[in-house]
Amino acid sequence: MQSIEDIWQETLQIVKKNMSKPSYDTWMKSTTAHSLEGNTFIISAPNNFVRDWLEKSYTQFIANILQEITGRLFDVRFIDGEQEENFEYTVIKPNPALDEDGIEIGKHMLNPRYVFDTFVIGSGNRFAHAASLAVAEAPAKAYNPLFIYGGVGLGKTHLMHAVGHYVQQHKDNAKVMYLSSEKFTNEFISSIRDNKTEEFRTKYRNVDVLLIDDIQFLAGKEGTQEEFFHTFNTLYDEQKQIIISSDRPPKEIPTLEDRLRSRFEWGLITDITPPDLETRIAILRKKAKADGLDIPNEVMLYIANQIDSNIRELEGALIRVVAYSSLVNKDITAGLAAEALKDIIPSSKSQVITISGIQEAVGEYFHVRLEDFKAKKRTKSIAFPRQIAMYLSRELTDASLPKIGDEFGGRDHTTVIHAHEKISQLLKTDQVLKNDLAEIEKNLRKAQNMF
């Protein structure tokens, strides 16, 4: 009897023999078997770009292979990470149910990619990660409820699933339930219509960990709020862990009943903010390593500078660059990345001069490594170019003094002021330095215009 994961792995082995390695690594390597819904085999892609391409180019190809392996004719459907979040993820069972043909009925398990090991920690999510790990290690004892809020694609769902996986792995027979508030609402309405409210209540009040996503969609739904209020109370009184996510803190959710709002505030409220540059680069490196991709540092720096909204778009941009490289059969460079991403990066964005771009231009001109700008080295061959880079950062960007200091290894803002004043004074009399800065700025703007 084969599980859907076994079938998908066998499918991938056949696909690999029929595709070039770059194409396979770009399109297929990061896919997973998601679930089996009736006669539809659902496959999870890492982002909507890969999903759309697979849907357009490989649907029938995959269906043929599945039929060859199983003897059954499946419909094939591809979903991406955002769509996955709208699925109900039910209790994970050690021995999953099988259908009449011996294939696992994958009733929406926790996303296998969303574990603590794959979560990249940065300044914007460090506290949320620590709180989630504490909850996973001691459900209902550390923080209950745990309320995580932040924008789309920043890692809220990843942390919730990671808690679910951890609890399942470390606590025998633990019942973990993940779903969206919209799914909760729809099931509640159906249970009333079908006279099955008791079954509905038993389902959601008989779990050890309840993970509920996008709670803001309960706003204005009085009947559903009433039901969730009692579900919350039952689980809390029985010392079961509740984790809730939202795009805003409880106090900012409109038309949310005060009694629910107060309960959400009983435990710990933590936010996740967009990743900073260093975290974005770390995310890209981890993604590249996980997918076995060899991406030059300057390309990751370019992508990280251009995509600063959320993790999903960041990883999607990387896949888009790799895919474009494969399609046009060219090496991955910063120029190729700019070409691949031109449709998703506003032209005004690509013209913005950044501190990291300045560091790169100054470093190239004076033959200084990027990491030396952030190091504590004070030799003149490094300290002087560093001061020039600080000066240009002050002149050519809108960054604050503390921000500039942070980008140069966490230096104090007074160091930035000193560097700016020193270079300003030298420019009054030093024609060579004037020429150097003019050339650096020219190179910098030329590089920006290339992208």
From Swiss-Prot:
<feature type="binding site">
    <location>
        <position position="156"/>
    </location>
    <ligand>
        <name>ATP</name>
    </ligand>
</feature>
<dbReference type="GO" id="GO:0005737">
    <property type="term" value="C:cytoplasm"/>
</dbReference>
<dbReference type="Pfam" id="PF08299">
    <property type="entry name" value="Bac_DnaA_C"/>
</dbReference>
<comment type="similarity">
    <text>Belongs to the DnaA family.</text>
</comment>
<comment type="function">
    <text>Plays an essential role in the initiation and regulation of chromosomal replication. ATP-DnaA binds to the origin of replication (oriC) to initiate formation of the DNA replication initiation complex once per cell cycle. Binds the DnaA box (a 9 base pair repeat at the origin) and separates the double-stranded (ds)DNA. Forms a right-handed helical filament on oriC DNA; dsDNA binds to the exterior of the filament while single-stranded (ss)DNA is stabiized in the filament's interior.</text>
</comment>
<feature type="binding site">
    <location>
        <position position="157"/>
    </location>
    <ligand>
        <name>ATP</name>
    </ligand>
</feature>
<dbReference type="Pfam" id="PF11638">
    <property type="entry name" value="DnaA_N"/>
</dbReference>
<feature type="region of interest" description="Domain I, interacts with DnaA modulators">
    <location>
        <begin position="1"/>
        <end position="72"/>
    </location>
</feature>
<feature type="region of interest" description="Domain II">
    <location>
        <begin position="72"/>
        <end position="108"/>
    </location>
</feature>
<dbReference type="GO" id="GO:0003688">
    <property type="term" value="F:DNA replication origin binding"/>
</dbReference>
<dbReference type="InterPro" id="IPR013159">
    <property type="entry name" value="DnaA_C"/>
</dbReference>
<dbReference type="InterPro" id="IPR013317">
    <property type="entry name" value="DnaA_dom"/>
</dbReference>
<feature type="region of interest" description="Domain IV, binds dsDNA">
    <location>
        <begin position="326"/>
        <end position="451"/>
    </location>
</feature>
<dbReference type="InterPro" id="IPR003593">
    <property type="entry name" value="AAA+_ATPase"/>
</dbReference>
<keyword id="KW-0238">DNA-binding</keyword>
<dbReference type="GO" id="GO:0005886">
    <property type="term" value="C:plasma membrane"/>
</dbReference>
<keyword id="KW-0235">DNA replication</keyword>
<keyword id="KW-0067">ATP-binding</keyword>
<comment type="function">
    <text>Strand separation requires the DnaA boxes and adjacent DnaA-trio motifs as well as ATP.</text>
</comment>
<comment type="subunit">
    <text>Oligomerizes as a right-handed, spiral filament on DNA at oriC.</text>
</comment>
<dbReference type="GO" id="GO:0006260">
    <property type="term" value="P:DNA replication"/>
</dbReference>
<dbReference type="InterPro" id="IPR018312">
    <property type="entry name" value="Chromosome_initiator_DnaA_CS"/>
</dbReference>
<keyword id="KW-0547">Nucleotide-binding</keyword>
<dbReference type="GO" id="GO:0016887">
    <property type="term" value="F:ATP hydrolysis activity"/>
</dbReference>
<feature type="binding site">
    <location>
        <position position="155"/>
    </location>
    <ligand>
        <name>ATP</name>
    </ligand>
</feature>
<dbReference type="InterPro" id="IPR010921">
    <property type="entry name" value="Trp_repressor/repl_initiator"/>
</dbReference>
<feature type="region of interest" description="Domain III, AAA+ region">
    <location>
        <begin position="109"/>
        <end position="325"/>
    </location>
</feature>
<feature type="binding site">
    <location>
        <position position="153"/>
    </location>
    <ligand>
        <name>ATP</name>
    </ligand>
</feature>
<dbReference type="InterPro" id="IPR020591">
    <property type="entry name" value="Chromosome_initiator_DnaA-like"/>
</dbReference>
<dbReference type="GO" id="GO:0006270">
    <property type="term" value="P:DNA replication initiation"/>
</dbReference>
<dbReference type="Pfam" id="PF00308">
    <property type="entry name" value="Bac_DnaA"/>
</dbReference>
<dbReference type="GO" id="GO:0008289">
    <property type="term" value="F:lipid binding"/>
</dbReference>
<dbReference type="GO" id="GO:0006275">
    <property type="term" value="P:regulation of DNA replication"/>
</dbReference>
<keyword id="KW-0963">Cytoplasm</keyword>
<dbReference type="InterPro" id="IPR027417">
    <property type="entry name" value="P-loop_NTPase"/>
</dbReference>
<dbReference type="InterPro" id="IPR038454">
    <property type="entry name" value="DnaA_N_sf"/>
</dbReference>
<protein>
    <recommendedName>
        <fullName>Chromosomal replication initiator protein DnaA</fullName>
    </recommendedName>
</protein>
<keyword id="KW-0446">Lipid-binding</keyword>
<dbReference type="InterPro" id="IPR001957">
    <property type="entry name" value="Chromosome_initiator_DnaA"/>
</dbReference>
<dbReference type="GO" id="GO:0005524">
    <property type="term" value="F:ATP binding"/>
</dbReference>
<dbReference type="InterPro" id="IPR024633">
    <property type="entry name" value="DnaA_N_dom"/>
</dbReference>
